A protein has these predicted regions:
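Bacterial Sec-dependent N-terminal signal peptides
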Residues: 1-50
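Formylglycine-dependent sulfatase
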Residues: 21-23, 39-209
Length: 209
């Protein structure tokens, strides 16, 4: 994942990836306090006269941290980094923010829900793929008992309480939209189960899907 905004390069070294998103993205969006979003899932719109930088966020499936010419471990290229030539990614990293310490779940839905909500998987409780309404996607096992999880995914706070096994949130794109941004989603969403509002990126604050 590459996160870009601003006009100068900033290297972030922090174990809490989501705290970094709160601190830098939401501060630039003019939203405060950050703890309100993280703790309750609701944020009030705050106006600001400061200029707003463009924000581009990439979530890339199955891309290793050494699969580009941009070093993500530290500022030095590894031997694997040197195998690749990705000058556009180098430029994006130079102009934006490069996270050098982060955590992502092993499958896509929990990570996507974390990016939208600012919560880790233990908080939003989406720990596997979301798919059909009210249906788990767990593999069956006679040995291991699997914990209950939110298989209906994340949902916009406008439908809070309507769906079982779901977490209602004010999504990051909605916060940005409320503060003057035009928001675009491209590609896979996989936030909520099919036939729920959370399955449609437009309900999460994206102007264009």
């Amino acid at each position: 994942m590459v996160l870009i905004f601003g006009e100068k390069a900033i290297t972030l070294e922090h174990n809490d990836f989501f705290t970094m998103i709160h601190k830098y993205l939401l501060t630039l969006a003019g939203v405060a306090p950050l703890a309100t979003w993280a703790g309750t899932g609701k944020v009030q719109t705050v106006t600001t006269n400061e200029s707003r930088p463009n924000i581009i966020m990439f979530l890339v499936d199955d891309m290793g941290w050494q699969d580009t010419s941009v070093p993500f471990y530290n500022n030095q290229q590894s031997k694997l980094n040197q195998r690749f030539r990705t000058p556009n990614m180098e430029r994006l990293a130079q102009l934006g923010v490069r996270f050098t310490e982060a955590y992502a779940c092993a499958i896509s839905s929990p990570t996507r829900c974390s990016l939208m909500s600012g919560m880790n998987a233990s908080r939003h409780r989406v720990t596997n793929w979301t798919l059909e309404l009210d249906q788990k996607t767990d593999a069956s096992s006679e040995v291991i008992g699997l914990p209950e999880w939110n298989y209906n995914g994340i949902q916009p706070d406008s439908v809070a309480g309507k769906y079982n096994n779901a977490t209602a949130i004010t999504a990051l794109p909605q916060i940005l939209k409320n503060n003057g941004y035009f928001t675009i989603h491209c590609g896979k969403a996989h936030f909520g189960a099919r036939n729920t509002p959370g399955a449609d990126p437009a309900t999460m604050g994206f102007d264009v899907n």
